[in-house]
């Protein structure tokens, strides 16, 4: 099964949106196999967002993601990358559909609440950047039989 890294960014934490966002993820049937509250330091932020280095918004992105605590989680499931991305909505909240996390809770692109892996390859890379193998739990739920064939 695919794995996706999700980061509830400092604005999501400060606005008290951890519970509502985690509820949506769990209600969709995705398995949370790793979860932690942490403060991302500048070195980790630069590694995570290395693809954006040199872009005009890079410095403000690093300042934002390191400005307060975040909740980082790993979710698994069939087609998890695509599912999570559709739940999250467009990067620009102004273009995010109602019913998505950003469409319902975010207002501007610079404070868009949540990061989600954009490909299976990046999902694996990001999971390994933020979690050690022993921090992840291979959890099976009793409800899985009602979610997966």
Curated annotation (Swiss-Prot):
It is found in: Cytoplasm. Its cofactor is Mg(2+). GO terms for biological process: CTP biosynthetic process; GTP biosynthetic process; UTP biosynthetic process. Its EC number is 2.7.4.6. It is an enzyme of class 2 (transferase). The active site is at 115 (pros-phosphohistidine intermediate). ATP binds at residues 9, 57, 85, 91, 102, 112. The keyword Iron-sulfur does not apply. One of its GO terms (molecular function) is nucleoside diphosphate kinase activity. PROSITE patterns: NDPK (PS00469), NDPK_LIKE (PS51374). Keywords: ATP-binding, Cytoplasm, Kinase, Magnesium, Metal-binding, Nucleotide metabolism, Nucleotide-binding, Phosphoprotein, Transferase. SUPFAM superfamilies: Nucleoside diphosphate kinase, NDK. This is Nucleoside diphosphate kinase. The gene is ndk.
């Amino acid at each position: 099964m695919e794995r996706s890294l999700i980061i509830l960014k400092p604005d999501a934490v400060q606005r008290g949106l951890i519970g509502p966002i985690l509820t949506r993820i769990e209600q969709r049937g995705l398995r949370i196999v790793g979860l932690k509250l942490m403060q991302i330091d500048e070195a980790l932020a630069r590694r995570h967002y290395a693809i954006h280095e040199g872009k005009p918004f890079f410095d403000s992105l690093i300042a934002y993601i390191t400005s307060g605590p975040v909740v980082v989680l790993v979710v698994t499931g069939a087609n998890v990358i695509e599912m999570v991305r559709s739940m999250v909505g467009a990067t620009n909240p102004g273009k995010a559909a109602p019913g998505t996390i950003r469409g319902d809770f975010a207002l501007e692109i610079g404070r868009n609440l949540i990061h989600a892996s954009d490909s299976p390859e990046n999902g694996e890379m990001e999971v390994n950047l933020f979690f050690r193998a022993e921090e992840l739990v291979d959890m099976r739920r009793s409800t899985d039989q009602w979610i997966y064939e």
